[in-house]
Amino acid sequence: PISVAVVGLGRSGYDIHIRRLRGDERFRIAAVTDLIGARSKEVQKEFGCQVFPDVDALLKGADAEAVIVATYSDTHAPISIQALKSGRAAICEKPIADSVADAKKMLSTAEKTGQKLLIHHNYRFFPETRHLLDVVQSKRIGEVFEIRMRALGFGRRYDWQTLRKFHGGVLNNTCPHFLDIGLRLLGSPVKEVFCDLRQIASFGDVEDHVKVLLRADNARVY
């Protein structure tokens, strides 16, 4: 099995990644680290894995071939780059980075080290997403001129995803799911972008309401 280290044991690291790996014979959870040490100890009890106090120690001593980066959004790029330079594949939670420059640095590091880099856009693997892409790309319903996607919910959150210093906000942490699918459905480079950001209900200092309009070269609108 492929040995995996997990950095960050919050909702994504534990509830999504470890839950999916649990019971899959193709993978072995080899090492973990989290800012809250008690979380690491809980995972160690279940899987008998190595526990490290921080990322640096994990990358120096973990018996792992791949590293899952499920940390605050502002740390995705530096930790992924560290993992790649340590000679391991990196599976990074979305968003990839906080800037195009950092994203390009991640890609160039993967190329230079010969290691694999995967950004975890899990929605693209859902059966309904794959079916939707097939229907649009095959033109079975004719030429698509407009695509609409909507996600609704209400919550008065006050955690790291509502704070700018951690690169929180709906645009960074929720919209990547829909932008990833939308860009593939558009099937052409984006020519125009309109974006309206508002903070309506959540605490913190970032947006919790986003309206995005994309217009592609092929005249499709998303």
Language-model-detected regions and their locations in the chain:
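Short loop/edge segments at beta-strand edges and connector loops
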Residues: 53, 92, 119-121, 194-197
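Short, Asp-centered acidic motifs that coordinate Mg2+ and/or phosphate
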Residues: 31, 65-66, 146, 221
